[in-house]
Design a protein with these regions (language model features):
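Short, intrinsically disordered low-complexity segments
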Residues: 277-303
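Glycine-rich loop/hinge motif
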Residues: 331-334
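A common structural junction motif
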Residues: 262-271, 311-322
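Inter-lobe coupling/hinge segments of SF2-like helicase ATPases
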Residues: 1-255, 263, 267, 271, ...
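Short, conserved charged micro-motifs
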Residues: 251-257, 300-311
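Short, aromatic/basic amphipathic alpha-helical patches
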Residues: 213-215, 308-314
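Short beta-strand elements
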Residues: 113, 269-281, 320-329
């Protein structure tokens, strides 16, 4: 990519070509806001949510920093908790707003629009925005995952996926499948109404199995390989998971209760089950409550509904100061 740019030269060249042909372009980046991190250059710390163990996302159009978990927000003039200055924060990384700023700088005569849950209004304004996109009046769409959800754009001929590596290394057994599905859906938007659609994927990991499968259109081979690896690891859809989330004020109380649950589970003496944890969850705090999780894994698909497990879960006595939730085959592991 050029200096101070988040969009590579090949992508810029293809957008230029599309504009010359009066074709529509979609730039896909599954990251809301302007930048995912605000960093104080004086103190070398990031701006974090006061309620959750997450970083605040800079939303330039709303003049604020926002937590995407609990909704907490502060003004863009907020001061660093350490140096008490509001002048040292710099945005790190791109979001759709930042990409739009770059597009406006590169192609000042092109009409562009962000397509995300933050920017897309409801009611009549939503219909007007959709009409502008469908008619081709909007030259360049900059969209998050929302754009992959069944929308059809007749004039769209070019799709460019920015930062395709995002999420490929997340600690989730479904991450490769999820990434493949989303990118496949997005690039499938190009040329849906014609045969000359084009798709570009901007990546630092071109040899990654997901991206190679997309490049070579080897979807069936990729999914079969993925299934074989899941079977070998005894994870869904071959095995099953139950996630137990404990939340409360004190981590030590949650860990102690988690150990108690683990001992209770061991006392059931079940075959083909494993239990992991208790451990602090990847997002360790949400809405000022600490989170601890246990994970139960079954080697066989039928075992998770075993009556002993159901009865044990139903009869757990939870202390008043702990919130307890059960998620069978969790889709997210935060």
């Amino acid at each position: 990519t050029p200096k101070n740019s988040w969009i590579s030269v090949p992508v810029i060249d293809q957008i230029k070509l599309s504009l010359e042909k009066k074709e529509q372009t979609l730039i896909f980046l599954n990251r809301r806001g302007y930048a995912p991190i605000a960093f104080c250059t004086a103190c070398r710390i990031s701006l974090n949510c006061k309620n959750c163990s997450t970083k605040l996302v800079y939303h330039k159009t709303k003049n604020c920093y926002l937590c995407h978990i609990c909704g907490y927000k502060v003004s863009e003039k907020t001061k660093c908790v350490k140096c008490k200055s509001d002048e040292n924060f710099i945005p790190i990384g791109p979001g759709v707003e930042r990409i739009r700023d770059e597009i406006s700088r590169l192609f000042p005569d092109a009409l562009s629009q962000i397509f995300s849950s933050d920017s897309f209004s409801k009611g009549e304004k939503h219909l007007e925005d959709m009409d502008k996109i469908k008619s081709g009046e909007i030259n360049i769409i900059i969209g998050t995952q929302l754009v992959a959800k069944g929308y059809n754009f007749p004039h769209l001929k070019l799709v460019a996926v920015i930062d395709a590596d995002m999420g490929l290394n997340a600690g989730d057994h479904r991450v490769m499948e999820k990434s493949y599905q989303v990118i496949k859906q997005v690039i499938g938007r190009a040329g849906r109404y014609a045969s000359d659609g084009r798709a570009l994927i901007q990546t630092w990991m071109p040899r990654h199995p997901v991206l190679q499968a997309l490049l070579k259109d080897h979807g069936e081979i990729f999914l079969n390989t993925e299934l074989e690896q899941r079977i070998e690891a005894n994870v869904p859809p071959h095995g099953k998971f139950i996630s137990l989330i404990l939340s409360g004020r004190k981590e030590s109380t949650l860990i102690d209760f988690g150990k108690e649950l683990k001992n209770q589970f061991y006392s059931l003496k079940l075959q083909d089950f494993e239990i992991f944890g208790p451990a602090v969850a990847p997002i360790s705090r949400i809405k000022n409550k600490t989170r601890v999780r246990l994970l139960i894994k079954s080697n066989k698909i039928t075992k998770i509904s075993q009556i002993e497990v159901r009865d044990w879960l139903k009869n757990i006595t939870v202390p008043n100061n702990i919130y307890f939730s059960v998620d069978i085959d969790p889709y997210n592991f935060y």
